[in-house]
């Protein structure tokens, strides 16, 4: 194809794409969804009276805040959540306001990536129990974990201790540091299931050596969903002069969190999972006493200004500020519902689906200790192959699940998951097993 033909093809494709987008925006379902999202700042939430009278009806009303079609069942918040209408509305309002280019201060827009963003850090700090000066707004836990792994002064032979159930976004930053700078990554092997907190603490304590500099672990592991005894692990680290860094990707929005009570040195999270904040909104918490021990990974103006505290870690240049509007709305929504209520719902739904799966012969990887479980259920179901059942569930039943090779199923139970949805999933699982037997 000559240059003129190529450019013509590109132009044609662009026109076709624009026409397709226009047709999509005219589609009644999509138009209706966005009209709903834009109709009001915060769609009316069910009240305490309904919750007291009929809990399931209360959650059914909250389910209407989400764009997930009524005939679909979503059991994969462990990967990514669905942002509800108040969050989508806030993101739209953020774009609607900022894209006018009408900021009163001429410097406001071009230095977006250099602002304190206190209007977003303040509510987050209150939500997780810290000061805003200890918070940097980053894109997700992976980015925060990379800042930690790259930013600490570690020497050849220094050891970082973690579990064998870390997400790649938590483990790989340390592996990169090991390959480049000669640190040593050591792992403790967690049993499946973890019987109790003491087992975890003993495994870590036995693995600590005089060269251990950092204990890094997932507050809730991505593999089995076990809630590790974070407060006790951080206390163990502190008692031995070791830094503690916690990957809390799953925690914010799933269960109550107070980083001060955990007494950790560093904490990261991905609120797009269980808080259902916009994708690309995350945070890095660094205890004030540790901030000056962490070097910037991404550098621009302000990186060497100690008075900025953790703010300097969020200075990356132009950023998606409307996503932060959405995260603020997600915090407000969680606060309006109540994290205690949300956590209780998460645990009840997960315990129910776990019992039902075990009745059907699944091998539970969830801890028998209720304190070490929340809203992720992992079971092993050999000889079922996860890739096959994932595809079958989605293509034939519109049910989204997640798992791991060869036969692990991981089920997430967000608060808007209804009992009738769980029953439908279980019926589909029974049908699949019968089909394969």
Language model feature labels by segment:
Residues 1-7:
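Twin-arginine (Tat) signal peptide motif
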């Amino acid at each position: 194809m000559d240059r003129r033909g190529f450019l013509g093809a590109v132009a044609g494709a662009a026109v076709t794409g624009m026409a397709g987008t226009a047709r999509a925006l005219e589609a009644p379902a999509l138009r209706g969804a966005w009209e709903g999202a834009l109709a009001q700042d915060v769609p009316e939430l069910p009240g305490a009276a309904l919750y007291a009278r009929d809990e399931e009806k209360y959650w059914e009303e909250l389910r209407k805040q989400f764009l997930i079609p009524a005939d679909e069942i979503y059991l994969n918040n462990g990967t990514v959540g669905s942002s509800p209408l108040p969050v989508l509305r806030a993101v739209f309002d953020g774009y609607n306001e900022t894209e006018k280019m009408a900021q009163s201060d001429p410097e406001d827009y071009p230095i977006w990536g250099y602002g304190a963003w206190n209007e977003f850090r303040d509510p987050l700090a209150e939500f997780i129990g810290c000061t805003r000066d200890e918070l940097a707004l980053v894109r997700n836990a992976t980015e925060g974990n990379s800042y930690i792994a790259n930013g600490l002064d570690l020497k050849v032979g220094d050891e970082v201790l973690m579990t064998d159930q870390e997400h790649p976004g938590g483990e790989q930053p340390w592996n990169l540091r090991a390959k480049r700078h000669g640190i040593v990554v050591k792992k403790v092997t967690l049993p499946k299931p973890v019987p109790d907190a003491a087992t975890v603490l003993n495994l870590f304590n036995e693995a600590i050596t005089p060269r251990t500099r950092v204990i890094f672990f997932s507050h809730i592991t991505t593999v089995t969903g076990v809630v590790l005894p974070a407060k006790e692990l951080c206390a163990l680290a502190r008692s031995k002069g070791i830094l503690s860094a916690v990957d809390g990707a799953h925690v914010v929005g799933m269960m109550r969190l107070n980083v001060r009570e955990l007494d950790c040195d560093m904490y990261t999270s991905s609120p797009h999972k269980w808080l259902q904040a916009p994708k690309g909104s995350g945070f890095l918490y660094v205890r004030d006493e540790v901030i000056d021990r962490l070097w910037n990974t991404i550098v621009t103006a302000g990186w060497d200004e100690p008075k900025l505290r953790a703010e300097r870690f969020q200075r990356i240049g132009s950023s998606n500020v409307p996503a932060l509007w959405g995260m603020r709305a997600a915090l407000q929504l969680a606060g309006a519902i109540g994290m205690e209520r949300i956590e209780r719902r998460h645990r009840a739904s997960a315990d129910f689906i776990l019992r039902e799966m075990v009745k059907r012969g699944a091998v539970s990887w969830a801890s028998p200790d209720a304190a070490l479980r929340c809203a992720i259920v992992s079971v092993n179901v050999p000889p079922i192959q996860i890739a096959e059942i994932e595809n079958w569930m989605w293509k034939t039943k519109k049910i989204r699940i997640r798992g791991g090779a060869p036969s692990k199923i991981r089920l997430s139970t967000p608060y808007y998951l209804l009992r009738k949805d769980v029953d439908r999933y279980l019926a589909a699982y029974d049908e699949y097993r019968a089909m394969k037997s």
